[in-house]
Amino acid sequence: MRVEETEVFKKYFKNLTDRERAVFEGGITLGALFHQFVGTPVSKYNKESLERAIEEAMKNQPCVYDIKVKIRNVGEKYVSLDGKMLDVDLKIKINKTVAHLKLEYIPEIDYPLMYVKKFEE
């Protein structure tokens, strides 16, 4: 049983709507991903395995329904992963609500932005 399926866990979130809870869990997951993996050595030779490792690690976070990680702008020589390179699509499911969240670099503001794309209910 996953931790989010236990009654003890659920009682701490009774004051939130399913949408609020999905955004909360998604923000924690994207923040954890960013701060855990930025700085990791990456090159074109290990890019795909690092993408899968990040996905599998983040699936351990509560309520993660699906996650896709792409690492952009990687050459032959290794570099340290930074926020400009991350392109992440995350789905968080709370009951019948699915929040679609995104982490991507936005050149116009020179910032790796985390945001909610949409909800399905």
UniProtKB/Swiss-Prot annotation:
GO terms for biological process: tetrahydromethanopterin biosynthetic process. GO terms for molecular function: dihydroneopterin aldolase activity. It catalyses: 7,8-dihydroneopterin = 6-hydroxymethyl-7,8-dihydropterin + glycolaldehyde. Its EC number is 4.1.2.25. Changing residue 61 to A: Has 20-fold lower kcat than wild-type. The keyword Lyase applies. Optimum pH is 8.3. Substrate binds at residues 25, 114. Keywords: Lyase. Changing residue 35 to N: Has 20-fold lower kcat than wild-type. The keyword Lyase applies. InterPro entries: DHN_aldolase_MptD, MptD_sf, MtpD_C. It is an enzyme of class 4 (lyase). Pathway: Cofactor biosynthesis; 5,6,7,8-tetrahydromethanopterin biosynthesis. Changing residue 25 to Q: Has 25-fold higher Km towards 7,8-dihydroneopterin than wild-type. SUPFAM superfamilies: MK0786-like. Belongs to the archaeal dihydroneopterin aldolase family. Homotetramer. Catalyzes the conversion of 7,8-dihydroneopterin (H2Neo) to 6-hydroxymethyl-7,8-dihydropterin (6-HMD). This is Dihydroneopterin aldolase.
